[in-house]
């Protein structure tokens, strides 16, 4: 079988770079963070420029953490400054390097998600100048995989030179630089980009390109730590591995030889993928990814509330989310027969002594290691496959009432429609079987079902009319009474993309 060559490209601090270019600033020389300051200092930073990261700032930290770190860095600069005094400030890294008397400053740019999507589309068009769409996987708004196996001979270029050519074209077209990884499979090009490229010096344009094959992967990364640097190894996986004496991918590979059963006991069928990756193997190709059709589909959404919500207001928000979910189903021609809801509780439930004293349930740790009440999770089955707004909203409200602890403050909500299928292929009530008995008036039951079918058909017409209006005049062209209630979020979220300002 012909050995394949893959390139992964990650646009450097994409959102932040776009904001710099729009201000005619150099992304590599500007201290800038993309964050919605209107949401308070606890808001998550969507992107941070490389120069600002150089002060020890995380790319996905909170805004208050950025401000605190800059404050600490300025305290150090003041201590070292002539006369121990800072005069003036700058957000340009070069000026700060030249003048030790300047205080570090930075720009806070509010997110513009629709604009970033436009930029991403322009960059994808650059990629298509070199590689056909069927050989490209769009992994995220700022990251792609390419199978360039059949293009190297055409361009008479090495994988490194082709990657550089594409990246420089993107740089010329948009002013945004990138990092690339090259590998003999999708996994290797990804970890080459994520891990190896980060540890090599950038060229004058900020470009880093790293290459791996199976043998160089084992030589270079079998001893690398932490495990969470590797693609698809999260904190939970890493913790389990470390508890069993495996601290590196080399440890995992060796254990797969001596005690493979342990890995399957720990991770089930997912152990196969982990073992493959430990050895640098990945059988999946771009072609296979493109051809993949999942056995079951789901459609859902989630949101982090901007402040802790009492249960009644959180229930309102969940009903709004169910309303939007039903309209998404109608728009896509899908139906569902099951909903799943997850409710995440706020840390204040345990930090407030009065609330803490009333809570006697299970306590877990969140992503930051803080104690919070364990989330609530539940499923409700619908009587039939449907995209009815009324049926889905009523079911979501019923499920919320069943699983939510009404005494706790709520911070996160997720709702998912599972068993999603095309409406045309969905089983109907006529296709199902039921046990007959002597005490049911089946004529009345059939009349009721017929009336319900008519009501659902009428509702579908209303839903489709609403979708037409919303697409033409915007999502807020039609609002319901609940959307104007205190605590409702749909109106604001309709003006967002991915939960951030459009």
Predicted segment positions?
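A glycine-rich phosphate-binding loop feature that marks nucleotide/adenosyl-phosphate handling sites
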Residues: 184-187, 276-279, 335-347, 409-422, ...
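Gly/Gly-Pro- and Ser/Thr-rich, intrinsically disordered tail segments characteristic of DNA damage-repair
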Residues: 1-277, 282-286, 443-502
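Short, well-ordered secondary-structure micro-motifs
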Residues: 191-192, 351-354, 425-428
